[in-house]
Amino acid sequence: MSSRRWVLAGLLALGAATSAGAEERRVPAKKVFPYLDAYLRIPPAQRSRFTPAYVFIKTRPTALWLVEGAARTPLPVDAEGRVLRLPNAEQIERGEILVSGPDKARYSVRLEMHPLVAPAAEMDAASLSAAVSQASAAAKSLAGPLSFAAPKFSGVLFPGGAQGEVIYANGRRAALPLDKGVARFNPADHPGARVVHFAKAPQDLLID
């Protein structure tokens, strides 16, 4: 599987111990969610087809909170390490993140891009293509002067999808290729595609 996901937040070294075997530390929200502020500044019409996801890799925190003054808001993290609720623009600018986890834990955060298309047995090919195009343009915008190094997205991966195929406007069908065992749809390779079809809905969609 090609790697067009960014490991952006680097390592967060946790500090003050709070109980045996556990530590927590406050860090600026921007350190945990880099580029989220820039994403939120993109006009909504230019980010209507995709959404960013921040995923803790290797080590997952036991708890994560957004801290604004005396207020704490929990930020759920799923079993895969993905943060399920992201701060808004004001919270990113002013808030802090309280990270709680194992003693002396260090974390890395990966930024992924996901289409705003619900996983289903049949999905509109044009919507998937639009998500890839928007995410590619946004990656260049987020990278700024380093746009030459920004990921060049070309398709969508379907983890958990089985027997994927493209159905064209003329009714023709073609099997989706596998990228290290995961079905992949590259819009540029399938002009005239109408829908992407699976025997069962994939678990997730990932722009890559």
Go through each PLM region and give its residues.
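N-terminal export leaders
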Residues: 3-8
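Sec-dependent signal peptide hydrophobic core
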Residues: 11-12
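N-terminal signal peptide c-region/cleavage motif recognized by signal peptidases
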Residues: 15-20
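N-terminal Sec/ER secretory leader and immediately downstream segment
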Residues: 22-94
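Extracellular ectodomain segments of secreted/surface proteins
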Residues: 23-56, 121-158
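Noncatalytic modules at the cell exterior or secretory-pathway interfaces
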Residues: 88-103, 187-199
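Short acidic/polar inter-strand loop motif in beta-rich domains
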Residues: 101-118, 201-206
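Glycine-rich, aromatic-bearing surface loops/beta-hairpins
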Residues: 139-208
